[in-house]
Amino acid sequence: MAPAKATNVVRLLLGSTALWLSQLGSGTVAASKSVTAHLAAKWPETPLLLEASEFMAEESNEKFWQFLETVQELAIYKQTESDYSYYNLILKKAGQFLDNLHINLLKFAFSIRAYSPAIQMFQQIAADEPPPDGCNAFVVIHKKHTCKINEIKKLLKKAASRTRPYLFKGDHKFPTNKENLPVVILYAEMGTRTFSAFHKVLSEKAQNEEILYVLRHYIQKPSSRKMYLSGYGVELAIKSTEYKALDDTQVKTVTNTTVEDETETNEVQGFLFGKLKEIYSDLRDNLTAFQKYLIESNKQMMPLKVWELQDLSFQAASQIMSAPVYDSIKLMKDISQNFPIKARSLTRIAVNQHMREEIKENQKDLQVRFKIQPGDARLFINGLRVDMDVYDAFSILDMLKLEGKMMNGLRNLGINGEDMSKFLKLNSHIWEYTYVLDIRHSSIMWINDLENDDLYITWPTSCQKLLKPVFPGSVPSIRRNFHNLVLFIDPAQEYTLDFIKLADVFYSHEVPLRIGFVFILNTDDEVDGANDAGVALWRAFNYIAEEFDISEAFISIVHMYQKVKKDQNILTVDNVKSVLQNTFPHANIWDILGIHSKYDEERKAGASFYKMTGLGPLPQALYNGEPFKHEEMNIKELKMAVLQRMMDASVYLQREVFLGTLNDRTNAIDFLMDRNNVVPRINTLILRTNQQYLNLISTSVTADVEDFSTFFFLDSQDKSAVIAKNMYYLTQDDESIISAVTLWIIADFDKPSGRKLLFNALKHMKTSVHSRLGIIYNPTSKINEENTAISRGILAAFLTQKNMFLRSFLGQLAKEEIATAIYSGDKIKTFLIEGMDKNAFEKKYNTVGVNIFRTHQLFCQDVLKLRPGEMGIVSNGRFLGPLDEDFYAEDFYLLEKITFSNLGEKIKGIVENMGINANNMSDFIMKVDALMSSVPKRASRYDVTFLRENHSVIKTNPQENDMFFNVIAIVDPLTREAQKMAQLLVVLGKIINMKIKLFMNCRGRLSEAPLESFYRFVLEPELMSGANDVSSLGPVAKFLDIPESPLLILNMITPEGWLVETVHSNCDLDNIHLKDTEKTVTAEYELEYLLLEGQCFDKVTEQPPRGLQFTLGTKNKPAVVDTIVMAHHGYFQLKANPGAWILRLHQGKSEDIYQIVGHEGTDSQADLEDIIVVLNSFKSKILKVKVKKETDKIKEDILTDEDEKTKGLWDSIKSFTVSLHKENKKEKDVLNIFSVASGHLYERFLRIMMLSVLRNTKTPVKFWLLKNYLSPTFKEVIPHMAKEYGFRYELVQYRWPRWLRQQTERQRIIWGYKILFLDVLFPLAVDKIIFVDADQIVRHDLKELRDFDLDGAPYGYTPFCDSRREMDGYRFWKTGYWASHLLRRKYHISALYVVDLKKFRRIGAGDRLRSQYQALSQDPNSLSNLDQDLPNNMIYQVAIKSLPQDWLWCETWCDDESKQRAKTIDLCNNPKTKESKLKAAARIVPEWVEYDAEIRQLLDHLENKKQDTILTHDEL
C-alpha cells in the first residue's frame, strides 16, 4: 500500500473511532487502575563503587587492588555529579580492567544489587568491633582500635603479644608473600579522602613486608535511601469468590501514588501503537484514546468454554510465531504474563497446521533423547541447563561470568564459533576421583589367595554369582580376588598386635578377602634377628613360607603375637623364638634369625615400597588400593570400614557384570587396578583439590623475557603470558611433536635441592611419552654471574642444543660431583658431551647475562608467591608449591598421568583436527588446559537440537564477528515457566550476545485454563535509576490495565532462601478489588531475612540427631536465633542477614549431649572451635554439620521426658523482638495457642478468636501466630492488643523447605503450615499446643482441652458432626475413598486440635506426615483439604485421639440442639447456602458482635492516637 493511501486509511479509521468514543462517553477511556509492588532490602542502599570493587575481587585479588588504586578518591565526585554521571564514571574506571561482556555483567550485577550483601556483611563485622565514635575510618591492630594514622606505629609495637584476629575468606588482603606479620585491618569507605590517606600509609608498610594489610568496607553514614531489589516474581492471582472473604470494615483506597502511564506492550489486538505514534505524531492523542479503548474492550474476562480451551497453547504459539522475530519473545511475555485478558483473543487465532505437525515431531524426538514431555520447560546456556525452579538471577550472573571467562580466553587464542563449543564441552572431572594405589607390587606379602588356595576350592568362580541376592550386610563368597586388604605395619610396634588379630579374624572366618602385609623393617644391614623383633619376624616368616607355605607362616605370626605380654603389647625376639622352637623343633633358630641368615632377602623392600607410595605415618591400610582415613584406623572402626567397603564394592561389581564390562575371562586384580584413578604413588600435593592455575593467555603482551624493566610493571596474567611465550623446552624428539603435558620445574639449580629436582625430572622424561620440560630459575641469593654458573649452563644448553644432547648435558649438570667441580674452579666446557655444538654453547654461556634470572625470580615472587630459592612445579598451568619435600620421578609420572587424563588428552584430540601450526600446538594445549581447569566443575552440557526448525522455533542470530552464547529455550507459552522465562530471555538479550532458539513446546487438549494469574518478573539488564537521568522508584512490578471486576490476591515469588514480609500496603493484598479503589494499589515488601539452611547428621550412627538445637549469633550476642533439626534429611533452617555469624549448639541438652565434629560450607577451618558462617550473597547458603555424642552421654536422648534446662533464647523461627516476655525455661501452666490467618477479614476473625479464648480462661495465654502472611496493620496492632488484654505472643516464621513439594495457591500453603511443621515451629520447652482456626469463637476454658488425656496419641481432633441430616449429600467422607480408607472410623475436622509435642516429636510424627504429603502431593487432585485430609489419611500411622463432639460445633454439619453444649463454634463454609462468614458470624454467635465492637473500639482508639502523634510531629 502506498504511504499516502495508508495515511488516509489510518486517519479515516481514527476519525470514525473518535466519533464513536465520544458518543460512548469519556468514562470508556478513563485512566486505568493499577497494582504495584516493591521489594526493599532491610539494610540501606550500599555505594555502587563498593559493589564494583566486590565484582573485581571475584575476578581476582590483584584486580581488586588495581581497581582500588584508580578510584581512591572517586567518591568526591558523588557530591558534585548526578547519579547518572557518577554511575558512568564507575563503569569507565571498571572498563580499564574488564572487557565489554564483563562491563555488561557489572551493569547487571548493579541492577540486581548482587554484591550489596557483601558490603553489608563487612558493615556488620565492623559493628561487632564496634567502631570508635565519630570516625570515618579506623584500623584494628590485634584488638586495639584507632582512627588516627599517626597512632598506627605505636599500636604495632606490641601487636605480636596480642591475639591475632580471625580473617575471613572474603577479606581483601593486600598482595604480599609473607603471612606471618602483624595484621592491620582498615575499616573504611573506598573512594573517600580518609580512606586514601590510610591506604597510602598501610600499602607502603605492606609492600615493605612490615604488616599484613586487610581492607574491610565500612560506611560511617549509610545512605538514607532504601535499596530496592530485583530478581523476583510477583503474581496477581484471580481468587475464587464462591465464599465472600472481604472485610466490610474496609474503606475505599484513596492514594496519590502514580504510576507511569504506559502499557506493558505496544501491541494491542494487532495494532503496533508505538510505531503508529512515531509515524503519525500529529494523531498521538487519537491513537492513545483508541489504544485505551481497545485495552478496555480486551479486558473482558468471560469464562471460556471447554472446547475453546483445547487448542489455546497452539493458538498462542501461532500468534507468537507469526510476529516479527525480534518482537516474538516480548509477545510471549505479554501473552503469558497477562493471560487472563489475552485468553479470549487467542481463541480467535487459527492454528498453523505446519507448526502443529512440526511441534509434535520435535516433541517425540525430545522425549526420546532428553525425557522432555510436552509442556515441560528447559533453558540451556552453552549447553548448561538452567533449572528455572532453582536458578535465580544471582546464580545466572555467576554462570555468565564463568562462561565469559572461558569464552574470552578461547577467543584470545583464536577460537570462535563451533570450535569454541567443542572446548566448552570439556569438563575437568579427574579431581573427583578417590585415588588408589596400585597393589600389584612384589613387596606385598599376600597371606591368602582366593583364586588358588585350597581353602576356597568349593566356592563358585563365576562373576554371575554376584548378581544373585544375598542377606543384607553380607558379601557374596566368590573365588575371585575382588576384595583386597593391604596392611602396612612395623612388626615391633604396639599397634601391630591389633592388626594381626584383625587379619586373623578375617582369615579364620573365611571372609572373601585377600589379605596382604607390607612389613616396614629396620634397614640397617648390621641389625639382625637376634636383637630386633621385626627382623626376627621377617626371617621366621620367610623360613616357614619356604619350608611349608604362606598360610602356615601367617598362622605362626598370629601365634607369636598371642605370646606377647598383655602389659607390653610389643613383640619381642623371644616371642618369635618360642614359636619357632615349639612349632618347628628341628629348625636351627640361629640359622634362621642370626647374622648369616639366608632368609633376609628383600628385607628393605617393604620400607622402600612404603616410602614410594607416599602414604602418611604408620600404620596404614588399603582396601583395593584405597587408603583408609586416619579416623578409620582405630581397630574397631577399621573392621566395620572394611566390611562396608566390601559391600559398596559388591554393588559396583554387580553393575559392571550387568553391563558386561566384567566377565569370567577378566583378571580380577587387573580389572581393579587398570582403572583411571589407580596411581603408583599417593602425593597429597598433586592430588589435593584446591588448585591454583596460571592464566597464560594475553592479547597484547610483546615484552621479552630479558626486558626486566618492562616485565616489572606487568600484571600477573601478562607476566605469566610472557614466561610462557619465551619458554624453551626439552622434548622427546627434535622433530615437531605435540606434547599434551607441559611441565615447568622451578628451583635454584645452583643448589643441591634444585639439581635433585632437575635429576628426577630428567629421569621421568626418559620414559615419558606425553610431556615436555621447561625450566624456571628462582635463585636463592642476589643474582650475579658467579652464583648462577649452573643455571647459566642450563639456559645456554636450552638455547643452543638439540634434544638428545640437551638431555644428556642437563643430566651431567644435575650430578653433585660435577657441580662441585665447577664451583671449585673447573670450566663448564670441560663437561660438555660428545656431539654438542660446543662453539654455540660457549658463546651463549659467556654472553647470556642474568636479566632472565631476575625476570624469572620476579615471576616466582609476584605470581607464584615463592620466596627466593623455593621450589615448585607447573603442569599445564597448574602450580604446585612450594615443595617441602623431595619430588620423585614417580611423582612426575603421577602428575603427568593426571594432567593427561584430566583434559590434556581430550584437548590434544580436538587440536589435532584444527590445522594449528604444530610448533604452537603444545603451547595451545597448555593454555587451554590451564583456562578450562581453572573453572570450578560444571554440570554436564547437553547438545540440544531440533529435528525441524521452520515453523515451531524462534531463531535470532548473534551479532557477527563477536563471540556469542548459545541459548536453547523450550517452553509452552502458556505456563508459569513461560511467564518467568520470557522476561529472562529479554534481559539476557541485552546483556550478552546470544544465538537463541526458542521451541514452542505446546500441550494439546487443555481441559482447564492453563494460567489463572497475571505475573511480572522484576529483572532488568541494568539499574533503572542511575543508568539514566530519569528519577525512578527503582525496580518495581507494575500491573497496568488490570480488569476491575475479579477479586485478586498478590503473591511474592522470591528466590529460595529469602524471607520477605509486607511492610506497607494501602489495601488488603489478599483481597484486591479494583472496583473499590480510586487509582493505584501499592504494596511494599521487605527482605526480612536471608535463610541459612543445613543438614546435620550424627557421625557415628549416620542418622539425623532429632531435636538437636543450634544457635546463631555473634561474639557479643551468642544466641540471636536458634532452630531444631528435623529427622527428615537432618534439615534445619536459621534466619539471618548479611554478616559473619557463629554457629553453636544450643545451651542445655544439645550442648551437654553432643559436640560438633565436622562441617562443610562454613567459613572456618574444621579444627576451629567456633564455626564461622558468612552470609555475603543473596544466594542460598547450605551447611553440612556432623555431630557426635559425648562419650558419657551415648545412651541419652534430647527428646526424653526430662525438663529441658535451656538458657538460650528461642528465636529461630520467630521474629527477633516481637515477644513481650521471653522465657528461658518451661512454664507448666500456660495455654499455648497456635493460629494462622491471611487477609484482613481473617485477621479480624483472629483478633475476635483471641479475645474469646482470653474471656473464657484464667490461665496465662501465649499465642503463636504464623507471621508469613500477616498484614502490616495486624503486626502493628498486636503489641497494643497484648498490652491491653495481658497475653503474650510470638510471631513464628518458617520457609517451606525446598526439598518438600511446593504448593502455589495461598490457601493450600497456609493449610500446609498448619500440619507439616509442628515439630519445628515451637521450642522444645512447649509441651502442648492447641491449634484454633481464626474464624472460631471459644466458649469454654481451653485449659480443659490442654489437659485432656490423649491416650498415647500425639494429637487429638474433633470428628465431623453427623447430626444435621439435610447436609448428608455433602458429607464426602461417607462415600468413595474415605469410606473405604476409614472403615468405621471418624473423619476429623482440622479447625481445632491439640498436639502433645513431646510425643509428636518422639515418634517422628512430623517426618511421617511430610513423607506421606510428599508422596500424595504428586497427584494434584489428592489432598484437596490438605490440613485435614493428611492427618486423616495417616490415621493408621499417626494415631488421632477423637475429642468429644462438644469441643467443636459448626452449623453446617451439627444440628441446632447440640449448639447449647458447644465449647467452640467454628464458622465452617456452607456448600449449600454459600453464606458469607461475616453474615454467618453475626447470625450464629451473638457474642461475636460484642467482641467485634470491642476490638473495633480499641483499633479506633489506636488510630486516633496515631493521628494525634502525626499532627503533633507536623506542628513541631
From Swiss-Prot:
* Modified sites of kind Phosphotyrosine: 1289
Q: How is its activity regulated?
A: Ethylenediaminetetraacetic acid completely abolishes catalytic activity. Catalytic activity is enhanced by complex formation with SELENOF.
Region (Glucosyltransferase), start-end ranges: 1220-1516
Q: In which pathway does it act?
A: Protein modification; protein glycosylation
Q: Which gene encodes it?
A: UGGT2
Tissue-level expression reads: Higher levels in kidney, pancreas, heart, and skeletal muscle.
In Swiss-Prot or TrEMBL terms, this protein is called UDP-glucose:glycoprotein glucosyltransferase 2
- Role this protein plays: Recognizes glycoproteins with minor folding defects. Reglucosylates single N-glycans near the misfolded part of the protein, thus providing quality control for protein folding in the endoplasmic reticulum. Reglucosylated proteins are recognized by calreticulin for recycling to the endoplasmic reticulum and refolding or degradation.
